[in-house]
Amino acid sequence: MSERPPEKTLAELASPNHECRACGYVYIPSQGDQKTSVSPGTPFEALPLNWKCPVCGAPRNYFISTGETDAPSGFAENLNYGFGFNRMSGGKKNLLIFGSLFVIFLFFLSLYGMG
């Protein structure tokens, strides 16, 4: 029997962002680059070889992959389960969790002030 290759998550399938090591500029493929007229949806690998960082002018080899930040972290078949939290990216989930904890903390602090 032949083994199936492991299934990739949506974050692994999405085109990764790349960050300039010289200045910190982040190339996001879904936004493209308006300064050098690179259309949205262009992956980093498809950029012209002479493309440079629009902020500091560093060449392409100064960029490192930082992964996709806006993609959901799970598998496609699991996105419809739950209350919609599976469609959120990791950063949005963190904001929701820690924001809720902060609101609960403020609630208990207000109870302390009442008594």
From Swiss-Prot:
Protein origin, superkingdom: Bacteria
Record domain Rubredoxin-like: where: 15-66
Entries under Pfam families matching the protein: Rubredoxin (PF00301)
GO molecular-function terms, A-Z: iron ion binding
InterPro entries registered for this protein in UniProt: Rubredoxin-like_dom, Rubredoxin_dom, Rubredoxin_ET, Rubredoxin_Fe_BS
Positions annotated to bind Fe cation: 20, 23, 53, 56
Cofactors (names): Fe(3+)
Coiled coil, from the record: none
PROSITE patterns per record: RUBREDOXIN, RUBREDOXIN_LIKE
Cofactor binding, per record: Binds 1 Fe(3+) ion per subunit.
Keyword annotations: Electron transport, Iron, Metal-binding, Transport
Function: Rubredoxin is a small nonheme, iron protein lacking acid-labile sulfide. Its single Fe, chelated to 4 Cys, functions as an electron acceptor and may also stabilize the conformation of the molecule. Could be involved in hydrogenase-linked redox processes.
Similarity comment text for this entry: Belongs to the rubredoxin family.
Name the UniProt record assigns to this protein: Rubredoxin
